[in-house]
């Protein structure tokens, strides 16, 4: 029987490449692959009742660190809490039991702080009988090490929790490893966002890029300007209250994840205008107002008064040092049609180059954000249109046409870069497109070593035109996992075949933990997803 969309030869090739059936008995399958892994054939057993996670005697963090206490509870449950299989009769227990994981934080723990771009996520993990040791400079490394430790443990054919003696040294290749979610095209319930944060932690992502508002809706509930969401959201039940936002930020912090909001302007702002009078530019048709509106009006003082107050609030709500300001896809037609803007352009000597007007607006906005002690991230058009950027402004490269050239130009100008162009997960295709994401290397462009140091990482972007809570998780995972390993693991971890074998197991592990990750290909999981 011919498979629709595949020739016989292609189908046979796919079947030949299928991974071993992903079951717990497959042993540990680490994802993302650590920097250095040494494993021994010597096996240790664990039991729920006899195993515990505690602190080493020299640890700077202890039982008062709620972040770690919550993580210990969470990972104990991840390891033992899904043991629902019918077991075979127990075999004679010949292996030595692993009784404890001792965690040591070496430096100031940062237990009550928020993660940032320079947070230390490195750790070492030594698993030997009768006690395993996890050591990290900060709590952020402990979180990453706990995830790795949990992945080392599997159940053998008798259902016994088993781990190989192991010695692991690990740290991330890039400091910025993000997922973009879009809550403007479709509202995503807080529960869905929290589930995404769980999955991000399983894949060692550390940035949630929250594209929170756009043309279609303004669900962010501003205390200073409540009419923005009252009139700009889809409905009053489709908003994120201050408590909702705080819940997301704190849930992320407990998993070592930063939350960076994006308030894109001057374009992508139609929803803003519904609740903020005179913010948008009136468009004209044959010398009369057409009744439609374009980008934010860049020539009014009231615009910048509003932006100053709004971003002052944003700076207090979101603790991360960076705010994403967008700046992409600004359409100039409405500005061109408006006689007041034409007069302003003439007064400023801008001629008919509306990129200079865009630059005028964005430079003022960058200054406002700097005044509230925040750094800025912008989409690549802001750089391409020669806006004068403040030092340290991060440029996010998203256009897929020769993105390597864009990386070269931005880094040559001395600006840090986030790469997203090859990782737009909303562009779905038949088959195993995760392989294409996996093969990308952010540093494969023509540039000096100093330039390549400016590539701080990347993001997998899932835009929301066709995504809501019903398909958010399976569309993200495990496709985003491929990006996660590329951004965490060493440059020489490139074998797609090896990745496939590990990722099928990791996908089942996510399913076991309640993440509805879609399958990579044919096969099964010992713990199938329960709705």
Curated annotation (Swiss-Prot):
Glycans are attached at residues 50, 116, 164, 301. Keywords: Cytoplasmic vesicle, Disulfide bond, Glycoprotein, Glycosidase, Hydrolase, Lipid metabolism, Lysosome, Signal. Its main location: other. It comes from the Eukaryota. One of its GO terms (biological process) is glycosaminoglycan metabolic process. Disulfide bonds join 65-111, 283-334, 508-525. It catalyses: Hydrolysis of terminal non-reducing N-acetyl-D-hexosamine residues in N-acetyl-beta-D-hexosaminides; N-acetyl-beta-D-galactosaminyl-(1->4)-beta-D-3-sulfogalactosyl-(1->4)-beta-D-glucosyl-(1<->1')-ceramide + H2O = a beta-D-3-sulfogalactosyl-(1->4)-beta-D-glucosyl-(1<->1')-ceramide + N-acetyl-beta-D-galactosamine; a ganglioside GM2 (d18:1(4E)) + H2O = a ganglioside GM3 (d18:1(4E)) + N-acetyl-beta-D-galactosamine; a ganglioside GM2 + H2O = a ganglioside GM3 + N-acetyl-beta-D-galactosamine. Transmembrane segments: none annotated. It is found in: Lysosome; Cytoplasmic vesicle, Secretory vesicle, Cortical granule. The active site is at 329 (proton donor). GO terms for cellular component: cortical granule; lysosome; membrane. The keyword Lipid metabolism applies. It is an enzyme of class 3 (hydrolase). It holds the Pfam family Glycohydro_20b2. It is linked to Defects in HEXB are responsible for Sandhoff disease (GM2-gangliosidosis type-II). This disorder is found in Korat cats (initially imported from Thailand). There are 3 forms of beta-hexosaminidase: hexosaminidase A is a heterodimer composed of one subunit alpha and one subunit beta (chain A and B); hexosaminidase B is a homodimer of two beta subunits (two chains A and B); hexosaminidase S is a homodimer of two alpha subunits. The composition of the dimer (isozyme A versus isozyme S) has a significant effect on the substrate specificity of the alpha subunit active site. This is Beta-hexosaminidase subunit beta. It comes from Felis catus (Cat).
């Amino acid at each position: 029987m011919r498979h629709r969309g595949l020739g016989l030869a292609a189908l046979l090739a796919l079947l030949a490449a299928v991974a071993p059936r992903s079951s717990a008995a497959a042993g540990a399958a680490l994802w993302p692959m650590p920097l250095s892994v040494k494993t021994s054939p010597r096996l240790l057993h664990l039991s729920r009742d006899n195993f515990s996670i505690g602190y080493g005697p020299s640890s700077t963090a202890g039982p008062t660190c709620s972040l770690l206490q919550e993580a210990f509870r969470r990972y104990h449950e991840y390891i033992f809490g899904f043991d629902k299989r019918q077991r075979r009769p127990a075999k004679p227990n010949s292996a030595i039991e692993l009784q404890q994981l001792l965690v040591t934080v070496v430096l100031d723990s940062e237990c009550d702080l928020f993660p940032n771009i320079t947070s230390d996520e490195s750790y070492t993990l030594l698993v030997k009988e009768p006690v395993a040791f996890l050591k990290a400079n900060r709590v952020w490394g402990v979180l990453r090490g706990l995830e790795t430790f949990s992945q080392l443990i599997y159940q053998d054919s008798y259902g016994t929790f088993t781990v190989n003696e192991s010695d692991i040294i690990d740290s991330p290749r890039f400091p910025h490893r993000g997922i973009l979610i879009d809550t403007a095209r479709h509202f995503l319930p807080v529960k869905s966002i929290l589930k995404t944060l769980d999955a991000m932690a399983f894949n060692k992502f550390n940035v949630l890029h929250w594209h929170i508002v756009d043309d279609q809706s303004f669900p962010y509930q501003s205390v200073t300007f409540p009419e923005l969401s009252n009139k700009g959201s889809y409905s009053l039940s489709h908003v994120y209250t201050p408590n909702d936002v705080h819940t997301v930020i704190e849930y992320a912090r407990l998993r070592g994840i930063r939350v960076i909001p994006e308030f894109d302007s001057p374009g992508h702002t139609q929803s803003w205008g519904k609740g903020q009078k005179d913010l948008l530019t009136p468009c004209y048709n044959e010398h009369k107002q057409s009744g439609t509106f374009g980008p934010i009006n860049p020539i009014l003082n009231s615009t910048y008064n509003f932006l100053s107050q709004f971003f002052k609030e944003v700076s207090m709500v979101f603790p991360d040092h960076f705010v994403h300001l967008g700046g992409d896809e600004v359409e100039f037609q409405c500005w061109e049609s408006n006689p007041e803007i034409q007069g302003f352009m003439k007064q400023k000597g801008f001629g008919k180059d509306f990129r200079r007007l865009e630059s005028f607006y964005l430079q003022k906005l960058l200054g406002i954000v700097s005044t509230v002690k925040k750094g800025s991230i912008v989409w690549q058009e802001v750089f391409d249109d020669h806006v004068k950027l403040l030092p340290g402004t991060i440029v996010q490269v998203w256009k897929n046409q020769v993105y390597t050239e864009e990386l070269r130009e931005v880094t040559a100008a001395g600006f840090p870069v986030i790469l997203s162009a090859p990782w737009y997960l909303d562009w779905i295709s038949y088959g195993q497109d995760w392989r294409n994401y996996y093969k990308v290397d952010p540093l494969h462009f023509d540039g000096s070593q100093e330039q390549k140091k400016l590539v701080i990482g990347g993001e997998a972007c899932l835009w929301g035109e066709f995504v809501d809570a019903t398909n958010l998780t399976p569309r993200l995972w495990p496709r985003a996992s491929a990006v996660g390993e590329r951004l965490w693991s060493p440059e020489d971890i490139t074998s797609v075949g090896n990745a496939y074998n590990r990722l099928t197991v990791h996908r089942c592990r996510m399913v076991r933990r309640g993440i509805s990750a879609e399958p990579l290909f044919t096969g099964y999981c010992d713990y199938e997803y329960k709705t």
